[in-house]
Amino acid sequence: LVDPVSSLIEPLIKLISGLSEPRTIPQIEVACGDNDVALIFRHMAAMSNEDMQKLHSFGREQSVQMFLQPEGLDSTHKIFPEDDNHLLHYRLPDYGLVFQFSPQDFTQVNLAVNRQMVARAVALLDIDPSDEVFDAFCGIGNFSLAISRFAKKVTGAEQSATSIARARDNAR
């Protein structure tokens, strides 16, 4: 893991072990943007007020966004900071692109690796300005939008309605 995520491991261990029912948290998802980290705590039992305070304190002390997911994906909600902004963002500066995404969207958590993957894909494709490219499983547009800088036309296909909407927003 890379910073800032790797620096959260020890504090997360301390946080989880200090909760009243640590065994009811089977997973923590991590999402990283250029300037933000978000953690989604999947929990199988109601959180006590004391545990909620610990989560808020952790978010404040570590400067991370905190989300809870008590049931399915639709149950995910932000608990810290208490604002309406649920999106993170990352840039692909070589392509003049900024991507907004939800912590639940499928993205590469290591931004440096993501930039390298996109650059490598673009180089391997050796795109000609007359090319028309089809990107199956385009997600939020990570590869499609970078490729669109070079190709005549790019068509992205995606099953997730949320990802399709996010890709459209990112294309604007």
Q: Where would I find each of the regions flagged by the language model?
A:
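A structural signal for short hydrophobic beta-strand segments in well-ordered beta-sheet cores
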Residues: I28-V30, Y90
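Carbohydrate-binding surface patches
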Residues: V30-A31, D36-M44
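Rossmann-like S-adenosyl-L-methionine
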Residues: A46-R172
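Charge-dense, low-complexity intrinsically disordered segments
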Residues: D3, R42, Q108
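Internal alpha/beta scaffold segment
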Residues: V2-T24, G33, A45-M66
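Residue-level recognition of the N-termini of beta-strands and the immediately preceding loop/turn
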Residues: I25-I28, D131
